[in-house]
Structures are given as structure tokens and as C-alpha cells.
């Protein structure tokens, strides 16, 4: 356990950020799972809306540094490909 005031604060902030990042990562995974579920249900309008939400969530996560921008780009590419394959 740190004794210096600034070190105590850093530990506290690290805990808070860990919780926030875990929550955001979980929300991102949930959004992607909702897209997969919408795609599986064969409801095109619902899947299109879910795709838009998933792409937006990936972009936001990359902008905030939650995931790497290349990871976001790769995931967007893959889900868009799956959507186009299912719709066409």
C-alpha cells in the first residue's frame, strides 16, 4: 500500500479507470452480440440499425483508446462483410 499522497491518488484513479474501461468494453461486446443476434434473426431493418450502432460503438471505443484503431477497423470490416453476405 502506498504511503505517499500522490501514489495513493494514482492507485485510486487506476481503480476507477479500470472499472470504467471494463464497463465500456462490456458495453461494446454487448453491442456486437446484439448485432449478431439481429443478423441471425434475418430481420434486415433491425440488423441494419444494429450494424450502425456497432460501427458507432467501435469508432467511439477506438477514439477513447479502449481498443486500437486497427482493431476497430478490422471488426467493422468483418461485421459489414457478414451483414452484406446475409442481406444479398
Swiss-Prot record:
Keywords: Ribonucleoprotein, Ribosomal protein, RNA-binding, rRNA-binding. The keyword tRNA-binding does not apply. GO terms for cellular component: cytosol; small ribosomal subunit. Pfam families: Ribosomal_S20p. Signal peptide: none annotated. InterPro entries: Ribosomal_bS20, Ribosomal_bS20_sf. The keyword Ribosomal protein applies. One of its GO terms (biological process) is translation. GO terms for molecular function: small ribosomal subunit rRNA binding; structural constituent of ribosome. It comes from the Bacteria. Binds directly to 16S ribosomal RNA. NCBIfam families: S20. HAMAP family: Ribosomal_bS20 (MF_00500). Belongs to the bacterial ribosomal protein bS20 family. This is Small ribosomal subunit protein bS20.
Amino acid at each position: 500500500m502506498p504511503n505517499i499522497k500522490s501514489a495513493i491518488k494514482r492507485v485510486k484513479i487506476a481503480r476507477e479507470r479500470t472499472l470504467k474501461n471494463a464497463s465500456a468494453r462490456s458495453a461494446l461486446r454487448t453491442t456486437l452480440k446484439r448485432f449478431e443476434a439481429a443478423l441471425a434473426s434475418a430481420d434486415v431493418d433491425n440488423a441494419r440499425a444494429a450494424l450502425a450502432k456497432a460501427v458507432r460503438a467501435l469508432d467511439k471505443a477506438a477514439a477513447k483508446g479502449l481498443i486500437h484503431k486497427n482493431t476497430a477497423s478490422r471488426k467493422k470490416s468483418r461485421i459489414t462483410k457478414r451483414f452484406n453476405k446475409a442481406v444479398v
